[in-house]
């Protein structure tokens, strides 16, 4: 609900509870903290396609750490309203081991950041079945489809990449 803080661990919103497989019943309790200030007027800092590769590969991780993140921090400090981030996908560039690099640097901003999955965030080795390609993303960043209320706005974050295909030579169909 909009009048409560968005539960987060560092920069990562945690608006969900994982449901264990093979259980007949499951209870998820959420602790809601009232907001200290209204979020009716808020600011979104939006970025897309950082496509981070591992350090020393193409300098994308270094550029994200040394240029992009300091710029976001500077921008964030100059804004008086509550700030939230939205990452529009392709957080990494096909390297599943780089999610911790992204998270470590995003945590430095001190701002809840909502993530949307991109085609390069999918596990490229499992692309014949779309549902298999999101496992690593979900382990690090959470669900691929979710929503959040900030102020009077309801934000919806949707995985619009459909990777089911007949063979590995085909590209993804939508997104």
PLM feature segments, named:
Residues 5-99:
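N-terminal active-site segment of His-dependent metallophosphoesterases
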């Amino acid at each position: 609900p909009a009048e409560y803080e968005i539960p987060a661990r560092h920069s990562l919103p945690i608006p969900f509870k994982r449901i264990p497989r093979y259980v007949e019943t499951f209870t998820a309790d959420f602790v809601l903290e009232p907001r200290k200030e209204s979020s009716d007027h808020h600011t979104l800092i939006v970025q897309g396609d950082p496509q981070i590769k591992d350090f020393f590969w193409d300098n994308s991780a270094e550029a994200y750490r040394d240029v992009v993140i300091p710029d976001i921090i500077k921008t964030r400090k100059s804004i008086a309203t509550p700030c939230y981030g939205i990452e529009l996908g392709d957080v990494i560039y096909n390297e599943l081991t780089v999610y911790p690099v992204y998270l470590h640097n995003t945590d430095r901003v001190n701002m809840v950041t909502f993530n949307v999955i991109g085609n390069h965030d999918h596990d490229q080795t499992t692309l014949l079945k779309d549902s298999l390609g999101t496992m690593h993303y979900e382990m690090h960043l959470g669900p691929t489809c979710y929503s959040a209320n900030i102020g009077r706005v309801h934000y919806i974050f949707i995985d619009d990449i459909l990777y089911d295909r007949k063979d590995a030579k085909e590209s993804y169909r939508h997104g």
